[in-house]
Structure formats: structure tokens, C-alpha cells
Amino acid sequence: MIVIQLLIAASLILWIRFLWSRRKLYMLMMQLPGRMGLPLLGNSVRYLIISRGRMSSRTTYMDKHGSTYMAWIGTTPIVITRDPKIAEKVLTSPFCINRSSQTTNALALSMGYGLLTLQGSKWMARRKHMNPAFKHSVLLSFLPIFNAETDLLVSVFDSFVGQGEKDVLSDLIRWSFAIATQTTLGTDVTKDDNFENDAILKTYQSMLRLTIINIFVPFVQNKIVSKLFGLEWLRRRDASAINKMINNILDKKLNSNPENYCESELKTVIHRAIELFRNDEMSLMELGAECSSMVLAAFETSAHTVYYALVLLAMFPEHQEMVFNEIKEHFPLAKGIEVTHTDLQQLVYLDRVLNETLRLMPSVPFSSRETLEDLRLSNGVVIPKGMTISIDIFNTQRNTDYWGSEAAQFNPENFLPEKIHDRHPYAFIPFSKGKRNCIGWRYGLMSSKLALVKILRNYKLKTSFPYENLEFVDHMVIKLAQSPQLAFERRTL
């Protein structure tokens, strides 16, 4: 009897200690709106199954309850906000340098520990080491690859002329994947059989799907649960295929003379990583993870950015004509275009269209951080240490308090210089911002803008899909519930 009483007392003490350790969390729950989730599952089931991951469900909730609220992903509480003031506080804070543990663990299962998944001082050291691979002169050396691969894409689109509306997203993904792999791993990657038959591309896409499951349903990160649902076998299969390809490339490069490569080849991510490996600043496993994660992060984001810009211009032909006239002024002839960085800098209206596309359809819809210390937000709310704060980029960039009553409408005039000057700097953060912004944002803009120049100089685009019917779905890269198809008409000038 005494033993039972002691066990009950001990259990009660542990339970009280547990509740006391979470007292700041419970205080936060009283300050912010939000609904309790299901045990173990949180709000994920409701969001993924009932709302089917529709971004509009978050928008509706914020419109009703305010720009900042609490949710539960599994057993993890998370603060979600679309307030630019809070976004600035979080993204510039030295106590919010780490991505959320939940997101990091999900990404690490897919791609190992590289720049996207490292935390704290390890991330800062790696970022410093990898910055030279993304400096301006290196990006300029990639222009021949951008031009060559976009010419191949244009030739594919040429076969679509007069054929009615076609799915173009899959071709854009192939284009972006070809660019991402060559600028990361070197141009010889295209000689791999798995590259030519799209096998490795499909493997990367499968890995992305598994990653989003691991983020939104975190209990499947457990290997036992993952095996039970058959996900562990898929993860190992995909990881094995990707590692095999990258290791084959690494073996060749590690055993070859650097003098055998041209200057642009030596500036790729893989050669920068090899340099760090030879200086004992990176392990062989980290080298492979860095290369894999760079490809994974780059190819779908650029493809979707170009796709969404083309879709919007097809839906709004008056803006498409303005872009075409600007491009035609710089490139009177459609054939044989070799786009330079100087050319890209002069296309001001195209810049506005691209920025407006990134505002309405940011490639990555959210950016999550974990607090290293208690953090007081601009609204006076204190976020406890160890809490995840997710910046809802999609809804931040459609926040009517900063973008006006027409925030959901396509309007490139939003990026006139005077309007940019008067707007909160964190109301537009398509590549995140602050201390841990996207290392490849200039790369993404340059490759996307160049592709738009060549496509729009050659073709007039049309679609029967109305703008009002676009429905956005949460994913690693923002997706559409139904993807509009495009019709191509060759420009005669």
C-alpha cells in the first residue's frame, strides 16, 4: 500500500513539475487566439485532411482572429504570424538564428546536415565558408549555362505552338533541375544515365514529398512509425539513389587535377565544398549533404517562380504586352539571344512583374525559427525559450494592412520606387530576410528573369483558367490545387 502511495505521490510531483515547466506556454495560450489540436496529431490532421492544406484556411483564420495565433503541429506548439513587425523582430534577432527543430529534423532526414539544416555556430561557420560560391562574379559565370538550358526549353515550347493549352510545369522543372545540378555539381552531371531519363529528378521529387510529410506529421520522423507506414523504405531508397550519383561525381572530382576544369567549373558549390574538405573544414559526409541540399533547395523554387510569372502574364495580357515591349526594345530579334547581366538590369518592368509574382506566390510559403531565449514581440507578447515561430510569408505578403484592400490582386505597380519606400521592409520577404536569408536568392532571380526574357520574347501566352480560381496548397514549395495550362502563339516580330 505504501509503495502504491509513493508511486502516486511521485507521479503527481512529476506531473506538477511538467506543468510548471510549461507555465510560460500556458500563459501564451491565454494571450493568443488558437484552437487546441488532437492528442499527438495537433492541428495537422484538420489542416491537411479537412482543409486539404489550402492556404486560404490560414488566411480566413487570421482575418477572423488576428494576424498572430497559436497552432499545434503534433505535440509541438507553434506561433504563426503574418505581421511584418513581428517578422522583422524574429528574423533579425540573434536568439532566433535556428530553424525550428521540427523542420530541421525533417530536412535532415532527407538531405543530411548541410547549410539548410545546421544550427547555431555550426551554421554560421558553414554559411561563411559557402558564401564565396554565391558571390556576384560566380553567378555571372553561370550565365552561359542559364542561356544554353533556356534555349533548350524554348525549343521544347516551340513544339507547343498551335497545339492548344499545354502543361508546362514539368518542362520548367526539368529546365530548373538541369541548371541546379550543373551549377552545383558541374556540367558533367548531365552525362549520367539517371539524369538523362529523369530518374534522379523523380527521386528528388519523391524526397521532397516525404519531407513535407515529416514536417506536418512529425511523429512519422520516428523510425519505428516510419517503417510501419512504409516511409522509411522510401526514404532509404531515395537517399541511396541520390548519394550514389553524388558520390560518383565526388570520386571523379577528388581524384582529378583541378587544372582539368575550366574556371566556371571550379566555382560551383561542389568544388567549393571539396576545397573545404581538403582543408579539413568539412567531412566527406557533410560534403555530399551540402551538394544534395543545394540541388533540393534550388530546382523546384526556380521552376515554380517562372511558371507562376508565365501564368499571371497569360491571365493579364495587358501586362504581358508591356513586358514584351520592354524586352523587344532590348532584343529586336527573337532568335540568337544571349542575355547578359547588363541586359537583365535594364528590364525594369519585368522586375516589377517578377516581384509581384513572388509577392502573390512566394516559392517557400513559410519561414520558421526557434527561440534560444525568451523573446518579447512588438505586440508585447513574450515567446518562451524553445518555442517555434513561423512567419507565414504567403499571408504576410497579402496583408491588407500593408498592401491595401486589393492585396490579393495582381498589380506590378506595387513595386514602383515610391511605394517600396513607404512600405514596411518586412512586408515583402519571398527569400526570407535577416540573419538567415536564402543564400541563393540572387541566383534564383537571375535564372528566373533570364528564362522569362527568352520565353516572352518568342511567345505570346494565353490561358482559359481564371485568376479567381487559383487555390494555393502548402508544400515545401507552394503548389496549386489545379495547375493552369498555357497556350503558345509564336511572336512574328
From Swiss-Prot:
Can you name a GO cellular component term?
Answer: endoplasmic reticulum membrane
**Could you tell me where this protein is found in the cell?**
Endoplasmic reticulum membrane; Microsome membrane
Signal peptide location in the record?
none
Gene3D superfamilies from the entry?
Cytochrome P450 (1.10.630.10)
User: What membrane topology is annotated for this entry?
Assistant: Peripheral membrane protein
The reply on keyword tRNA processing is: no
Q: Which UniProt keywords apply?
A: Endoplasmic reticulum, Heme, Iron, Membrane, Metal-binding, Microsome, Monooxygenase, Oxidoreductase
Major location (coarse): endoplasmic reticulum
Pfam families associated with the record: p450 (PF00067)
**Database matches in CDD domains:** CYP313-like (cd11057)
Q: Name one GO molecular function term.
A: iron ion binding
Record field: transmembrane: none
Q: What is its EC number?
A: 1.14.-.-
Q: Where does heme bind?
A: 438
Q: Does the keyword Metal-binding apply?
A: yes
Function summary: May be involved in the metabolism of insect hormones and in the breakdown of synthetic insecticides.
Quote the protein name from its UniProt record.
Probable cytochrome P450 313a2
